[in-house]
Amino acid sequence: DTAAQATPASRTLGWYVWNGQALLDHPARMTTLPKGSERILISFTAPQLRALTRPAGQKRLLQLIAQAHAQGLRVELLLGEATWVLPARRQALLDLLAPLRNLAFDGLHLDLERSQLPPAQQPSWDEAVVDTLRAVRAAIDWPLALTTHYRELQAPDFARRIQDTGVTELVAMVYVSNPVRAAEIARPLLQGPPGLRLAVAQSIERSLPPDESNYLLGQTQALRRWHQLSQVLETLPGFSGIVVQSWDEFKKARP
């Protein structure tokens, strides 16, 4: 078996794709995604995003999304810059989004993490992220999702406050490679407010230690672990799958 076919799976896998331009240039690469893949979260640089708003760029994006949909994949725009939560930087995010709002993405996915802010600004993250998400929700029509560390979701009322901004999905970064332990962490998070979906982010990054990342296990074993984790959680209401950080790192891992 190749890694792509290793584990029969329900369609619960998603992938962070930080080099979206490579996929735009070579859409056929999507056919190498493992079985069970249902979504790609795809990111571009600011100049690449500007190019997508021009007729030629829009045409290529539509072709990519059409091919993805034919494979049963959703395509969500992924943006990640920690400082966007700060009041002084919030408008920069809104300005970036304004010309993009009519593009054919299936959703907008923001990766916003407290730990990536300067230490002095971390205590105000909770309020800042809520205000930012509310502003983004008012500016776009796509479904809106947030990726952040699972510890944020353990705070009382955090998930409800995020849902109140108009976010429909949270992705909890549970960078724990042991699927039993990862399920123990994720299970209570799925007791959140009704209607808010929750996915679990897992890592196959080379730079992380083996207790956090599945990189050293290789593709086939990593897929087995994610399938195991998904099977444990998919009986719980609101579970919306596993999202892997990242597609590029997965391809570098051994089969």
Positions of predicted regions on the chain:
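Boundary/entry segment of secreted carbohydrate-active catalytic domains
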Residues: 2-38, 43, 79-81, 142-150, ...
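Active-site groove signature of glycoside hydrolases
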Residues: 39-48, 96-125, 240-246
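Short, acidic/polar
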Residues: 19-34, 87-101, 152-163, 182-185, ...
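Aromatic-lined substrate-binding rim segments of carbohydrate-active enzymes
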Residues: 42, 46-80, 119-146
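Substrate-binding cleft of secreted/luminal carbohydrate-active enzymes
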Residues: 175-179, 198-255
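Acidic (Asp/Glu)-rich catalytic clusters
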Residues: 29-36, 56-72, 97-104, 159-165, ...
